[in-house]
């Protein structure tokens, strides 16, 4: 992220920054970038309020259009950060798609209640299936927009009631982008 900020401060063109970000070899799960037409998709492990703020700051610096976000909150963890993360998302994104993350043994509906209780915004919805949330986020993109997919990063599974279900945000996004490209051809 620091390299992106430096490029912005040096007045490097947004197009070159996006190309450079896509070519960076960052740790898995941290600012993994996918290019989709004129859009940028960023997959990041950001799962705290501070981490979300940092990812949004970068996204706004490199985005000519709108920023959208897909995120969820982990179960059996700090409940107080859930509403904070929802507020950050709603204040920094054109539209927010809330979904599940790793509910572990906690009831996912209770997690959604914690995420939305007292939330005074109308730019969000809950999509209960994470894959559907990601594909919906991609479908919302117009020219020069950015989609943030936050919370899971490099993780290869979702933990639900002790079961580890194979799932990877980057893989899901790539597969859907390829489906779209194939349907156009």
Predicted regions and their residues:
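ATP-dependent carboxylate-amine ligase
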Residues: 2-185
């Amino acid at each position: 992220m620091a390299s992106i900020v430096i490029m912005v401060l040096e007045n490097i063109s947004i197009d070159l920054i996006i190309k450079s970000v896509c070519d960076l070899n960052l740790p898995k799960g941290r600012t993994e970038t996918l290019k989709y037409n004129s859009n940028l998709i960023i997959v990041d492990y950001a799962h705290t309020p501070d981490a979300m703020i940092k990812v949004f700051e970068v996204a706004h610096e490199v985005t000519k259009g709108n920023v959208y976000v897909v995120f969820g909150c982990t179960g059996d963890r700090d409940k107080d950060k859930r509403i904070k993360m929802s507020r950050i998302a709603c204040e920094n994104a054109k539209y927010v798609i809330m979904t599940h993350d790793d509910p572990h043994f906690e009831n996912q509906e209770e997690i959604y209640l914690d995420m939305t209780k007292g939330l005074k915004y109308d730019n969000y919805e809950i999509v209960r299936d994470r894959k559907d949330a990601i594909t919906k986020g991609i479908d919302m993109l117009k020219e020069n927009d950015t989609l943030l997919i936050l919370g899971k990063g490099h993780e290869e599974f979702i933990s639900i009631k002790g079961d580890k279900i194979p799932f990877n945000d980057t893989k899901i996004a790539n597969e859907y982008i390829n489906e779209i490209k194939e349907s156009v051809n």
